[in-house]
From Swiss-Prot:
InterPro entries xrefs: Spore_germination_GerPA
UniProt keyword list: Germination, Sporulation
Protein name as annotated: Probable spore germination protein GerPA
Entry's Gene Ontology BP terms: sporulation resulting in formation of a cellular spore
Source domain of life: Bacteria
Amino acid sequence: MPAIVGAFKINAIGTSGVVHIGDCITISPQAQVRTFAGAGSFNTGDSLKVMNYQNATNVYDNDAVDQPIVANA
């Protein structure tokens, strides 16, 4: 469905970032990364109080491929 898009400004895009404006049928990644982080790892703010006394992150992942990118060129 067509849309009218007003003015916009892009300050920064990462190396694997995607910016799409308008109609699109598929957006396919060109790279993949697997990130493991425990409780409170990605908190942001001015004054945080994180109370995670005993924490364990389960990193067991039994599948071989999470996001296939073989044919995404």
